[in-house]
Amino acid sequence: MRDIVFVSPQLYLSSQEGWKSDSAKSGFIPILKNDLQRFQDSLKHIVDARNSLSETLLNSKDDGSIHNSDQNTGLNKDKEASIADNNSANKCATSSSRYQELKQFLPISLDQQIHTVSLQGVSSSFSRGQIESLLDHCLNLALTETQSNSALKVEAWSSFSSFLDTQDIFIRFSKVDEDEAFVNTLNYCKALFAFIRKLHEDFKIELHLDLNTKEYVEDRTGTIPSVKPEKASEFYSVFKNIEDQTDERNSKKEQLDDSSTQYKVDTNTLSDLPSDALDQLCKDIIEFRTKVVSIEKEKKMKSTYEESRRQRHQMQKVFDQIRKNHSGAKGSANTEEEDTNMEDEDEEDDTEDDLALEKRKEERDLEESNRRYEDMLHQLHSNTEPKIKSIRADIMSAENYEEHLEKNRSLYLKELLHLANDVHYDHHRSFKEQEERRDEEDRAKNGNAKELAPIQLSDGKAISAGKAAAITLPEGTVKSENYNADKNVSESSEHVKIKFDFKKAIDHSVESSSEDEGYRESELPPTKPSERSAAEDRLPFTADELNIRLTNLKESRYVDELVREFLGVYEDELVEYILENIRVNQSKQALLNELRETFDEDGETIADRLWSRKEFRLGT
């Protein structure tokens, strides 16, 4: 506080002595002592302007007495114009003398905060003089209707515009001894505005009170004054007159703006151009200039809007800082009180009763429980509820799994193709051929593992090891001898000698198996290989039945996926060609001949897959 001084710009401009104070006063704003000289310099040019204006008026009067009558006439006109401008400037200065910038208007005490109210919904087109005229008329009407002789007046006011068409007016009333006059005035103004809003929809002004002011008024409110309809009509007529003046001024301004765009091009400057091109050129010039003026208007409106947003953001920062400082002061005060209470407890522990200690302990426990509750509530909102929502979404997806799977079937098939689930098949088509070639090389080098060495029986007959393994051995057979026999067969080409009982069992099984094979061969009809391949090659369906089966095959998109698998892209024309070939020829060989031209060796694989589909099977 030692580095802060309180100053009043109004008193300084009126050259009064008490414009500076070390303590807070009504209408004074706090500044740093280091900024005092800067404050005086900023207001000094206003005083110099007033002095120069007075000297100009005096000099013009002296010059008027010297010149002749003709010159006096012209000078009188100039003096009248200058005097009129001076009077209008003085009126504006007088009418806006109670207006303060928003930073200077901020209340610095609780009394100023209580006596500050706001009007919302005031048109942004109202000038400062019109706003003060409206405020004075409203205040005089309220004091008259409430029959109050109080010296209540508007001490200062400011405005803040968050939109382009409306603004908020902040009003600070002077503090008077009669609180009843201030309370009755606010109640009457609030009732007056509400009554007019019910009658006229174009009247948007509303009185807004801060929380402290609202409680202050409610505690001191007796009977709410009634509003007479004729008084409301009188105030509304004043409001409409001000609004009409504003509309007239805006219309003149619009006409001036229109005149800046509606102009004629001087064709004399375009004399060197052909006459048939002048009309179009003039239109282009007017259109271009109109476009430029419109862009400038839009930029101006945008800058106005951005300025209002910036002011609003600045106000929000100021209010947040005030709130932060206020809460910080309260927190420091509470901390000091707690420290003081702890010291008092240590000093007066013997004298303080147990009831007060228990009460204080309960309060601390309550604060701790409230803090834990807030932490748990934050945990619920930040972690638990999002997890529950995610689990519910998973449950709903699981309940409708089949429907979801069927709906996105094509996407999943594409995902299987693009994400390379089968790496060797998708990216290495020759992998199967390489494996087959390696298997043949291994068989040529190491022999075929399926063709085991034959087992020589004791009676001179030979049987393969596979058949010998399939024979069920009788009970009592020596396992060790069988193990040695198998070992000898796998490791060397020596003949294995088997016991007589084992020989009998093997001979009996060989005879029975040969009889079964002969019986099966006798039952099967003789079929030529050419007839069998021809039957497999042709489709045994009628034309209508084949069309139905081809339609089902087309709807399953199996042929599309085959083409996509071997070509890498979808080809609808190729799919139609394949289906048409099957419909016309009904032959696997004819289809294979056509596919080899496009797919080479893969054509045989495609034909085999198509002929193995259920659509081409009998009984399906």
UniProtKB/Swiss-Prot annotation:
Q: Which GO terms describe its molecular function?
A: RNA binding
Q: Which residues form a coiled coil?
A: 296-385
Q: Does the record carry Cytoplasm as a key word?
A: yes
Query: Which segments carry the region annotation Disordered?
Result: 58-82, 246-270, 323-373, 428-452, 509-537
Residue spans of biased composition, Basic and acidic residues class? 246-256, 356-373, 431-445, 517-537
One BP term from GO: mRNA processing
What are the entry keywords? Coiled coil, Cytoplasm, mRNA processing, mRNA splicing, Nucleus, Phosphoprotein, Ribonucleoprotein, RNA-binding, Spliceosome
**Which GO terms of the cellular component aspect does the record hold?**
cytoplasm; spliceosomal complex
Gene3D superfamilies with a match to the protein in the record = PWI domain
Q: Which InterPro entries match?
A: PWI_dom
Function text: Component of the U1 snRNP particle, which recognizes and binds the 5'-splice site of pre-mRNA. Together with other non-snRNP factors, U1 snRNP forms the spliceosomal commitment complex, that targets pre-mRNA to the splicing pathway.
This chain belongs to which protein, by name? U1 small nuclear ribonucleoprotein component SNU71
Origin organism is Saccharomyces cerevisiae (strain YJM789)
Taxonomy of the source species:
Eukaryota, Fungi, Dikarya, Ascomycota, Saccharomycotina
